[in-house]
């Protein structure tokens, strides 16, 4: 029996744009620049609360090469020309699990937080799957930062926005996170999938 194939690692870039339609044209026109740096368009997302907050996920062949590209004047220039109006937040994700089953739900929740110990946190996280299902959340991606398994990023499909929001603010979740060794407050980002490649 062959071992399961590890999901592709991801480069996530989040920023605000002046005009989404104009930005998208410019983004897609620069595809050869990304491909030359081992990056492959995967998903474009728009913030649920602010649709001009855009998150781009690219499949990443090589984290070191991606980091060089992220720091390059060429990328800065391309972003400026595309109408990016905020400093980008850039993350390099070592993806541990990804559910790629087709799903028509379009809303996602990304949660990012620091953990004291990956293995202890993961064991606790796995034991609370039913709680997430009851809150209208389906596990989609489990990842940590390349080279640092203390910075965890999770993506969930949201089937019930009211339940998901209530759960994300609940004392129950806060308690479970503390027990699992989450260190500091989590960041929550609700978004819609605008385009898949």
PLM segments and residue spans:
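Short S/T/G/P-rich N-terminal loop/turn motif that feeds into the first structured element of a domain
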Residues: 1-197
């Amino acid at each position: 029996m062959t071992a399961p194939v590890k999901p592709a690692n991801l480069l996530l870039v989040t920023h605000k744009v002046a005009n989404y339609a104009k930005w998208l044209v410019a983004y897609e026109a620069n595809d050869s620049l990304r491909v030359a740096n081992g990056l492959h368009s995967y998903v474009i997302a728009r913030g649920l609360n602010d649709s001009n907050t855009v998150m781009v996920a690219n499949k990443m062949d090589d984290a070191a090469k991606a980091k060089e590209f992220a720091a390059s004047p060429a990328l800065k220039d391309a972003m400026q020309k595309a109408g990016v109006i905020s400093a980008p937040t850039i993350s390099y994700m070592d993806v541990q699990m990804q559910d790629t089953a087709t799903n028509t739900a379009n809303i996602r929740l990304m949660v990012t937080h620091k953990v004291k110990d990956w293995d202890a946190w993961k064991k606790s996280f796995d034991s609370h799957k039913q709680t997430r299902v009851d809150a209208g959340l389906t596990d989609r991606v489990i990842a940590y930062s390349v080279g640092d398994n203390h910075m965890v990023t999770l993506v969930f499909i949201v089937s019930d926005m009211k339940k998901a929001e209530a759960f994300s603010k609940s004392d129950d979740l806060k308690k479970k996170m503390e027990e699992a060794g989450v260190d500091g407050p989590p960041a929550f980002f609700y978004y819609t999938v605008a385009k898949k490649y």
